[in-house]
Amino acid sequence: MAAAKTEMLLPALQISDPLSFPHSPTDNYPKLEEMIMLNSAGTPFLNATAPEGAVFGSGEPGEQFDHLAGDTLSEISMEKPLSDQTYSTQRLPPISYTGRFTLEPATNCSNSLWAEPLFSLVSGLVGINPPPASIPSSTSQATHPSSSSTSSIPSSSSSSTSSASLSCSVHQSEPNPIYSAAPTYSSASPDIFPESGPNFSTTVGTSLQYSSSTYPSAKTCNPSFSVPMIPDYLFTQQQSEISLVPPDQKPIQTQAGQQPALTPLHTIKAFATQTGSQDLKSVYQSQLIKPSRMRKYPNRPSKTPPHERPYACPVETCDRRFSRSDELTRHIRIHTGQKPFQCRICMRNFSRSDHLTTHIRTHTGEKPFACEICGRKFARSDERKRHTKIHMRQKDKKAEKGATAAVQSSVSNISISASSPVSSYPSPITSYPSPVSSFPSPVNSCYSSPVHTSYPSPSIATTYPSATSTFQTQVATSFPTSVASNIYSSPVTTPLPDMQSALSPRTADIC
């Protein structure tokens, strides 16, 4: 602060190179001593620069700074005009300020970056002596006037002269002064900036004693302290300054722990329109570092050969190729996440125009695709295709069922024709001729009449009509005479002669 205030009195001190910034605190100490000596000698220049009442209105030191007790950071405004300041005596004439103001943040400050230089400028413009900044923190503390702090430097602490002329005022003969903000220091030794000055010089040269307990001590800076007039994004934060960030703000991380950023949309659009440019392609491929998602079937070959697909995806990890540029543009939207097509009804976005068209049909109820088999309508062609496959499967099942039924019927017909009962009769019929022919004479001689009378031939002939009709030729060739009499005559002839004698009376009785 002291360095900034000494630079304001340019004609009196003849400071060489007033725009050199920053100054060391020890560079301006001889000049301060010279100013105090001039003031104690009664130099009219210093007394004319600022009236005695300009600093202390009624002669009471610190009266003008009663409203600055405590934390006065939010009470000082840059827009406060000169007319708002209350002075008991003469007011300063309006002065037009021209020049260049340079505020450079102190990188070695442990807490704030802009507070002290900013309020040095505010105090110079408004005309109020700001309270000195506490050394460990950048918050402004209303401890005592700056004039007393400058007079409490060891080199000039013994003088009890008035230091009111050292206030932030402008010499009337210099209409265009140039102000430079004082540098901020992260630490300072107590012999340069003591915490509280025991002696405060008055305007009449008498010294009054003030206890240090009257003023609040320097409080530690809150890590969440921030100047509301300066946005946080105007300066970059180093790794050692992450503790300065408020807890509700995320610190800036390095690119090593982050996911690589997506390629800008204008870059991909330019690549899609100028795919043939090799220089452009090399530049864009260097920017496309985001790993793409794996393909569902990476080893499946494409139907189109590679030489017929000249449009390759610019993403390094994507091996997709396309035969048309619009297909490539549509594919690139997968990587970028661009959805330029928006539904005007529900405001939903889509990456493809055909997806938007089919989506609009859900709102309108339009179903232009009808099934050719059952007539059912669908809003999308793929839905109709999927529905048609159901009919095809049903048709195939019916065809399979019909084929199995036909096969079963043919097999049953073949089995019936192969195992018919008519074909089983020839063997027993053909086996009888030998025993019948072996006894032709006994049957005809002994029991010719009884058999014919007991079992008439018409009854026997009606018993087996099919057999006699089916094998008429075979039976006729083998047995030209009565077949029935030959078949049933053999059991009668087999009994013994005594049985024949016993049966003969019965036959006689029957007759």
UniProtKB/Swiss-Prot annotation:
Positions with biased composition (Low complexity): 137-169
Compositional bias ranges of the Basic residues kind: 386-396
Keywords, in A-Z order: Activator, Biological rhythms, Cytoplasm, DNA-binding, Metal-binding, Nucleus, Repeat, Transcription, Transcription regulation, Zinc, Zinc-finger
Biological process terms in GO annotation: camera-type eye development; circadian regulation of gene expression; embryonic retina morphogenesis in camera-type eye; embryonic viscerocranium morphogenesis; positive regulation of DNA-templated transcription; positive regulation of transcription by RNA polymerase II; regulation of transcription by RNA polymerase II; retina layer formation
Tissue expr: Detected in muscle and brain.
Primary location group: nucleus
GO cellular component, one term: nucleus
Region (Disordered): 133-169, 291-312, 384-406
Changes seen on gene knockout: Knockouts show subtle abnormalities in the inner plexiform layer, outer plexiform layer and Muller Glia cell tiling.
Entry-linked Pfam families: DUF3432, DUF3446, zf-C2H2
Compartments reported by the entry: Nucleus; Cytoplasm
A GO MF label: double-stranded methylated DNA binding
Residue spans, zinc finger C2H2-type: 311-335, 341-363, 369-391
PANTHER family, sorted: EARLY GROWTH RESPONSE PROTEIN 1, KRUEPPEL-LIKE TRANSCRIPTION FACTOR
Family classification: Belongs to the EGR C2H2-type zinc-finger protein family.
Function: Transcriptional regulator. Recognizes and binds to the DNA sequence 5'-GCG(T/G)GGGCG-3'(EGR-site) in the promoter region of target genes. Binds double-stranded target DNA, irrespective of the cytosine methylation status. Regulates the transcription of numerous target genes, and thereby plays an important role in regulating the response to growth factors, DNA damage, and ischemia. Plays a role in the regulation of cell survival, proliferation and cell death. Mediates responses to ischemia and hypoxia; regulates the expression of proteins that are involved in inflammatory processes.
Name of the protein: Early growth response protein 1
Lineage, uppermost ranks: Eukaryota, Metazoa, Chordata, Craniata, Vertebrata
